[in-house]
Amino acid sequence: MYHSIKRFLIGKPLKSQAAGEQKLTKLKALAMLSSDALSSVAYGTEQILIILATISAAAFWYSIPIAVGVLILLLALILSYRQIIYAYPQGGGAYIVSKENLGEKPGLIAGGSLLVDYILTVAVSISAGTDAITSAFPALHDYHVPIAIFLVLVIMILNLRGLSESASILAYPVYLFVVALLVLIAVGLFKLMTGQIDQPAHHTSLGTPVAGITLFLLLKAFSSGCSALTGVEAISNAIPAFKNPPARNAARTLAMMGILLAILFSGITVLAYGYGTAPKPDETVVSQIASETFGRNVFYYVIQGVTSLILVLAANTGFSAFPQLAFNLARDQYMPRMFTVRGDRLGFSNGIIFLGFASIVLIILFGGQTEHLIPLYAVGVFIPFTLSQTGMCMKWIKQKPKGWIGKMLINSCGALISFMVLSILFVTKFNVVWPVLIFMPIVVLLFFAIKNHYTAVGEQLRIVDKEPEEIKGTVVIVPVAGVTTVVQKSIHYAKSLSDQVIAVHVSFDREQEKKFEKRWEELNNGVRLVTLHSSYRSLVHPFDKFLETVEAKAKKEQFSVMVLFPQFITKKRWHTILHNQSAFLLRVRLFWKKDIMVATLPYHFKK
């Protein structure tokens, strides 16, 4: 049943040789890895206007120079990450760059920031998309969290089916969103230039002095507008997912994403200024622009529909980049090794599943209202932005390749602007982003704890010249609850392993104890029976004390100790709950006894 459902949802397993077929073309990669960045167009301009609106609508013209500043940062980031892609074609992005050029701790800070950011990406994007759905269908408002969880599971399953297949499905809505917004911008600009739009009374021309405007407020608006740049780094983390040559294809995809993002963001910002659009609590800026441009007709609803869809699909960037980044960290032993294992469909399925359930936990904890996580989301991006650009500067200074000064200037510009935005975010939104100062050290400490564990394990597993202690034999202990054919087979097998076999029975009743001893004598199997009476009906405690005694004597004689458990394997799985799980309790207890071997002898029921 389980396997049938798994095959239906995820598909048939793929051979390792088919890994090349799961690689992404540039167009598929653009849809898979750029959905987060492109979706930010839906709210980037609005975030700027919300800050400017605290002064007055007359300040809206500042959105144009602020947008220019955002575009300059976008250009710096695209050029910088293009250099990272060619310098580190194995992927890893900010984590690898920071670790190799700035040191272990900066690398882990960058990697940890991105891991947390991808979890936030999924939670925030899905919640935003769910908001759009429940706004269109108010009757579903009470089911906000279940809908969000369902959407996370759908995208998780699509990614478990493999990169290529999920990209083929998700490409359509992403490109539909791009085309719809390009049409909106083109028609809107045409109407502006031909005077078909009536500008509101509060509309002011560029350069008009505005009372009360401050540098602090403009910087705050700029940092809010930089939310449009979230997701730019995803391509550099997932270079191995591209078809050959991966670095060149990734660089071209990054350039395509940058061009599209610049056109869409600047187009929406210009239209918002030209139309005099003011942010409203019950209607988005994009919705107002579409309504003003087309009226409430079919195309308006198409734009609203694809905008809602792209907000949901923005989560897919996290599902594409998180597993690859987790693989890089796990390969360096900073995360559990399970993140290096490919699943049935050749994706890093453990990373995909972990991300899905971590984001579901966030959605449940915040009741689906994750808007106040957006500043954390932005900080989580600009920390690795700053570290990776600084790391690249150090790389060029150390190596001094041909043309290194120009390359260093590009990365220096990116590092400086990213650091400025990060500083502005901390200064202007400290009351929201302060948790970063707590959870990032915790994440880094967790990385070190995992690394220390693997290092300690490696030291203990290393073969040394010292000869191991000679073992003269083994004492095999067989716990028995009754005189059955299962016990007979277990005793017979134990005797094939050693001459030193002891059967142990824990009794709660004196009369039953005597009856059991009598039946054991009748078997005449030549194996000594030890009966342990438990006055307090504890199975584990008397057995544990007996083992301590046997273990102490065995050590003196240079004997090892093995406990052999007979185990029932029922024909139907649900039958298992009908049987006493005492053997399981004893086994769990023995796992922590380092000098005792534990073995299980299964007995399969036929009916």
Swiss-Prot record:
Recorded consequence of changing Y43N: Abolishes potassium uptake
Which parts of the chain span the membrane according to its record? 31-49, 63-84, 106-134, 143-162, 167-190, 215-238, 250-271, 299-323, 348-366, 373-393, 406-428, 432-447
Enumerate the UniProt keywords alphabetically. Cell membrane, Ion transport, Membrane, Metal-binding, Potassium, Potassium transport, Symport, Transmembrane, Transmembrane helix, Transport
Q: How is its activity regulated?
A: Potassium uptake increases at lower external pH and is abolished by the proton ionophore carbonyl cyanide m-chlorophenylhydrazone (CCCP). Binds cyclic di-AMP (c-di-AMP), which inhibits the potassium transport activity.
Q: Which gene specifies this protein's sequence?
A: kimA
- Reaction(s) this enzyme catalyzes, per UniProt: K(+)(in) + H(+)(in) = K(+)(out) + H(+)(out)
Organism (species): Bacillus subtilis (strain 168)
This protein is called Potassium transporter KimA
Keyword Transmembrane present in the record's keywords: the answer is: yes
Q: Which residues lie on this side of the membrane: Extracellular?
A: 50-62, 135-142, 191-214, 272-298, 367-372, 429-431
